């Protein structure tokens, strides 16, 4: 999957670990959305 920036990772992608994964059709079972304002396409989810 494509990595994405969770709220807990910091304010920007520079120098921060991207702990989320983009899921186009929503988070799979056992995962949760980790952003307050999600990406334009899909959801940024983490385990």
Curated annotation (Swiss-Prot):
Signal peptide range in chain numbering: none
Gene Ontology CC terms, in alphabetical order: extracellular region; nematocyst
Pfam families in the cross-refs: Toxin_4 (PF00706)
Primary localization: secreted
GO MF annotations, alphabetized: sodium channel regulator activity; toxin activity
InterPro entries in the cross-refs: Anenome_toxin, Myo_ane_neurotoxin_sf
Gene3D superfamilies: Anthopleurin-A (2.20.20.10)
GO BP annotations, alphabetical order: regulation of signal transduction
Location(s) in or outside the cell: Secreted; Nematocyst
Site feature Important for toxin activity on Nav channels, where: 16
Keywords: Disulfide bond, Ion channel impairing toxin, Nematocyst, Neurotoxin, Secreted, Toxin, Voltage-gated sodium channel impairing toxin
Cystine connections: 4-44, 6-34, 27-45
Function: Binds to the sodium channels Nav1.1/SCN1A (EC(50)=453 nM), Nav1.5/SCN5A (EC(50)=440 nM) and Nav1.6/SCN8A (EC(50)=1740 nM), thereby delaying their inactivation. Also inhibits Nav1.2/SCN2A, Nav1.3/SCN3A, and Nav1.4/SCN4A, but to a lesser extent. Toxin effect on Nav1.1 and Nav1.6 (and on Nav1.5, but in a lesser extent) consists in an incomplete inactivation.
Family according to the record: Belongs to the sea anemone sodium channel inhibitory toxin family. Type I subfamily.
Additional note from the record: Negative results: does not show activity on Nav1.7/SCN9A.
Name of the protein: Delta-actitoxin-Bcg1d
